[in-house]
C-alpha cells in the first residue's frame, strides 16, 4: 500500500475512533445525567411531574397491557403512595400499590370531587390528564398524608377541636410524638393558638404561604393540611415533609451532577490525549526524528543509517527486519536505504573517475609531451647555424616532425570524437549491409598495414549470408580499433580471430586472441578513456582512445560489448546486436 493511502486510512481511522469515543462519552453522559435527574426528581415523588414527563414514562402494548417505567414506581414509593390510570369511562386501566379502600371505578360525581378537593377519603391526590396512543386517560397519584392523619386523630381524641387550650395531655403527647404542630387561624390568617409550634414556623403561617404550599409542596420542610372549621376558624396541622427538596437545592444538586459528568468527560479526554500523544510519539515521532538524523548524516557525508550502541541500524532488529514502530514508514526507509546505497556507489564512482582522470591526464600529457619534444628538438637543430645539414638529413628530420604532428592531430581528432559520442552529437547513417564481405574487406585492409605484420589475423563464420543495418565508416572504425588493440598489446606470432555468428534473435562479433590476456583491474577500466595510455615510440602507435571510441560506436548501433580475458591465455571481446 502506498504511503499516502496508509496516511489516509490511518488518520481516517483515528478520526473515526475520536468521533466514536466522543459519541459514546456524550451518550453515556446523557444517560448518567438522566438517571441522576430521575433520582433527584423521584425524591419529591410525583409532585413535580408534568404531563410530558408522565407520557414519556408510559406506554401501552398491543395486548392492552401497560408498560410503566420504574422511575414512576420509585417516585410513588417515595411518598408511600399509590397510582391509578383511569380511562374515559371512569374505569381503572392500570394500578400500582392501590389500597383496598380505593375504588376501581369512579363516577362523574367522584371525579368532580377529586378535581375540586384533590382528596379521596383519607388520601391526598395529584392528577394529570394524559394522552397515550391517541386515547385520553386520567392519572391519579394518591398518598396518605401524615398531616391529614394528624388532624383526623385530633378530631377523634377531642370533642372541641377548636379549643386547643383544653386538649388532653395524651393528645398533646401524640402530636409531639408525630413531630407535628397544630394551629388555629382566624379568617384573616392570624394565629389564634397553637400546639408544639416553632417561632420560625409561626412567622410563615399565613394564607399566602398556604396557597404557595399547595402549588409547590416540595419547597417546604413541613407537610401541611388544612381543615375549615367554620367561616371564621381554620385548623392547620404540620408534620415533617417526606418529599422536601427545594428547587434551589435540586438545582444545586443537579449542577453538581452536571459538573461531575463534565469532569469525568474531561478526565477521559485528557487521558485519551495523553495516550494518543505517547502513541503518536512512538508511531510518528521516532521514525520522523530517525529520518531527520539519517538525512543529517547524509548531508555531512556519513553515508549510513544512524546506529544504536550495539552498532546496529536503529530501525532494524537483530534479524535485519524493520522494527514495529518504523514499519508504517517502511517505504520511506527502503527509499532512504536506496538513496544511501546510491550515494555510496556514486562516491565510489567519483573516486574511480577521479583516479582514472588523473591517470588519463598523466598519460595524455606524456603522449603530447613526447612528440612535442621531438618536434621542438628537430626545429632547434634545423634553426641552428652551427650545423650545415645535408638534404638527406633535413628530409629525415622533416619526416619525424611530420609523423609526430600526424600523431598529435590523430590524438586530437580521437578526443573530439569521444566527446561527440558522449554528447550524442555524432551523425550516423545506417543502411542494410551484408556483413561477411564487409568484414573480410576490413580485415584484408588492416592486414596490409605494416604494424600488423607478424600477426596471424583470420576471419571465421559458419554462416553464408548475414545482413545488418550499420554505418559502414563507423563500423569499420570499431573493428579496426579492436584489431589494433589486439596487435598493440600482444607480441608477434599472436593468433587473432574475427568470428561472426548469429542466432534467432542476435548477431555476435568476436575478436579473439591467444595473447597475454588481462587482469581484473585492467578489464574493469578497459573502456575508460586513455586508461592504458600509449607511447609514440611504439611501432603500433595509437592514441589510447580506441576502445573507448569502439564502445561508444557499438552503443550508437544499439549493441553491447563485453570482455572475457585470462592472463597468459588470451582475450575475447564480444559485440552483440539484436536483430531488427
From Swiss-Prot:
Residues 1-6, 283-580 are cytoplasmic. It is an enzyme of class 2 (transferase). The keyword Nucleotide-binding applies. Its main location: membrane. Its EC number is 2.7.13.3. One of its GO terms (biological process) is phosphorelay signal transduction system. Residues 28-261 are extracellular. The chain crosses the membrane at residues 7-27, 262-282. Disulfide bonds: none annotated. It comes from the Bacteria. The gene is yvrG. Residues 363-580 form the Histidine kinase domain. PANTHER family: PHOSPHATE REGULON SENSOR PROTEIN PHOR. Member of the two-component regulatory system YvrG/YvrH that positively regulates 7 transcriptional units (wprA, wapA-yxxG, dltABCDE, sunA, sunT-bdbA-yolJ-bdbB, sigO-rsoA, and sigX-rsiX), and negatively regulates the lytABC operon. Probably activates YvrH by phosphorylation. It holds the Pfam family HATPase_c. Keywords: ATP-binding, Cell membrane, Kinase, Membrane, Nucleotide-binding, Phosphoprotein, Transferase, Transmembrane, Transmembrane helix, Two-component regulatory system. InterPro entries: 2-comp_sensor_kinase (IPR050351), HATPase_C_sf (IPR036890), His_kinase_dom (IPR005467), HisK_dim/P_dom (IPR003661), HisK_dim/P_sf (IPR036097), Sig_transdc_His_kin-like_C (IPR004358). It is a multi-pass membrane protein. GO terms for molecular function: ATP binding; histidine phosphotransfer kinase activity; phosphorelay sensor kinase activity. One of its GO terms (cellular component) is plasma membrane. This is Sensor histidine kinase YvrG. The modification Phosphohistidine is found at residue 366.
